[in-house]
């Protein structure tokens, strides 16, 4: 439509110019000099018409819709009066869309537009109101926050469950002794340990070495200490059971909402085996119409006959030989029957 209006306006101007020229011609032809030479006379109306035609050619047709539209929207830089917009002209000047300079120019313009939009959003009160409404009405999701709720629960546990098992106590006591020995070696305070080893050497060790005796002494001491700990813990447990048989514990329990199971997307090529499967060769097995009929009497075409030969394990050359032998035998029998009639 715009191109039609652009093309239409100059036509109107040209038509007016033609009319003015025709009128000028008529005036020159109508008035002649005394010598019979035509004299050219200029009318004021002609000059006005020429001015109008020039103005109509120079400007975009003011009476047309395009002229009215451009008159009101000339201040907008995004609207181009010609064939290309300013941005398109700049891209063409840089060598087209596929050049590096044009791409850089487009990214710069995009970044400039993004910054301008951000500034307008910060200044806009309506945008802030919309953002606040979205924050209020958004539902809790996995990224925003936890899906579970906090509940306080009372759990009643008997004191027997808090007792340390014997094996764990032995490991702890051995570890404590090893740490004490290491500290003593570091600070060179080995007197209490040497006395303990001497006391253990007086005990019957049955011809063991010094290291084995030391280990036996340690094990015996550990056993004694463990027994003492057991007795002490039992006594303390009895006292606790007398005072408070059960103990209440308050703890925070989080009940998570059931999340939907994530669907595992599988590609159809994942189900295929790594090595290509061998295609089973086609073979005819069992009794069929082909196996019931004789090879020579088989009514099918050559391809089916060949397939029948392969299924039976017969090669075509052998089959042709068999048919020839049968034909020869049949011909001999016929000749033997015909021979007695001649005599």
UniProtKB/Swiss-Prot annotation:
Biased segments, Acidic residues type: 219-228
Residue numbers spanned by region Disordered: 1-27, 205-247
Entry-linked InterPro entries: DUF5520
Organism: Bos taurus
UniProt superkingdom: Eukaryota
Lineage: Eukaryota, Metazoa, Chordata, Craniata, Vertebrata
Entry protein name: Uncharacterized protein C10orf120 homolog
Pfam families registered for this protein in UniProt: DUF5520
Signal peptide: none
Ranges of compositional bias, category Basic and acidic residues: 16-27, 229-247
Known function: Dispensable for normal development and fertility.
